[in-house]
């Protein structure tokens, strides 16, 4: 199955999921709930700017809470959003990524709410296959600081529209690109430019993808390398040679008995 086929399947499924959600909480009601939430915390998003957190961090680790993946199945089915994200924060994460896709990643919006409830105060990335505005309302309501937009899932116009709305809601955008075809989206000027090292067609990861594509990114932007990072030396290379400031890592920590301690040990070797 090719990358386009997998994404087509996921996006088609996501449209059905969103329509079901809308029947449960109608769009107008979701807007009202989100507006009420935006009045809290002085109108600011919880966690503050993810971009600033990465740029000002010595490590730039975005620790991911991911219980499951399409390629590996369950990684940590028993993982609790009330425990692991807070442990990540205590052990040095610059920001968090929390999967909220149900079927493919075993995640829920409520996981972000739970993390915030127990005291997570650093930026949280809402990681899902975002294809329409309703999901941005969900992200803002549950306590996300930033949202992931995947170039391969969206037309350029759709991406621009969603990015503008995310900004109106006070959230930042991490735009994920995987290959040179996606780079026409770079001119939309997202807050953070992500390069995914995982081929969604084969699920093979190749960190060299970040080095290859980094040269094509605008200079002086916040670059994030996603997937396939397991060695502290790789993070050093990405930072020094590729100019990356963020490093999204999930499976490397989640497969360990204690993800937070695994993060601390990784950071100690940077």
Describe each PLM feature range.
Residues 212-216, 255-270:
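C-terminal helical cap(s) of enzyme catalytic domains, especially alpha/beta-barrels
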Residues 8, 94, 145, 191, ...:
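Receiver (REC) domain switch/active-site residues of two-component response regulators
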Residues 2-76:
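An N-cap/entry alpha-helix motif that binds or orients negatively charged groups
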Residues 60, 65, 72-174, 181-185, ...:
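N-terminal active-site wall of soluble small-molecule enzyme domains
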Residues 207-215, 221-226, 230-233, 250:
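Catalytic alpha/beta core domains of metabolic enzymes, predominantly
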Residues 98, 138-158, 195-204, 243-263:
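Glycine-rich phosphate-binding active-site loops on the catalytic face of alpha/beta enzymes
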Residues 131-143, 178-189, 225-249, 261:
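Catalytic cores of alpha/beta
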């Amino acid at each position: 199955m090719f990358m386009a086929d997998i994404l087509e399947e996921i996006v088609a499924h996501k449209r059905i999921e969103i329509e079901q959600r809308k029947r449960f909480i109608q769009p107008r009601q979701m807007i009202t709930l989100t507006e009420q939430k935006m009045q809290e915390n002085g109108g600011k998003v919880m966690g503050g700017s993810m971009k600033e957190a990465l740029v000002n961090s010595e490590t730039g680790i975005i620790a991911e809470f991911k219980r499951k993946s399409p390629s590996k199945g369950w990684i940590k089915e028993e993982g609790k959003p009330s425990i692991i994200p807070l442990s990540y924060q205590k052990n040095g994460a610059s920001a968090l990524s929390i999967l909220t896709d149900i079927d493919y990643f075993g995640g829920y919006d409520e996981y972000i709410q739970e993390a915030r409830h127990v005291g997570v105060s650093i930026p949280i990335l809402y990681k899902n296959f975002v294809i329409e505005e309703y999901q941005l309302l969900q992200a803002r309501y549950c306590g996300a600081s930033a949202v992931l937009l995947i170039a391969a899932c969206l037309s350029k116009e759709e991406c621009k529209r969603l990015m503008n709305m995310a900004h109106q809601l006070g959230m930042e955008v991490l735009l994920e690109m995987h290959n040179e075809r996606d780079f026409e989206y770079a001119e939309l000027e997202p807050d953070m430019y992500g390069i995914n090292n995982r081929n969604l067609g084969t699920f093979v990861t190749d960190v060299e993808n970040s080095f290859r594509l980094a040269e094509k990114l605008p200079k002086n932007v916040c670059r994030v390398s996603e997937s396939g990072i397991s060695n502290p030396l790789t993070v050093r290379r990405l930072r020094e040679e590729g100019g990356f400031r963020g490093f999204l890592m999930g499976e490397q920590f989640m497969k360990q008995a204690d993800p937070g301690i695994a993060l601390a040990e990784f950071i100690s070797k940077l």
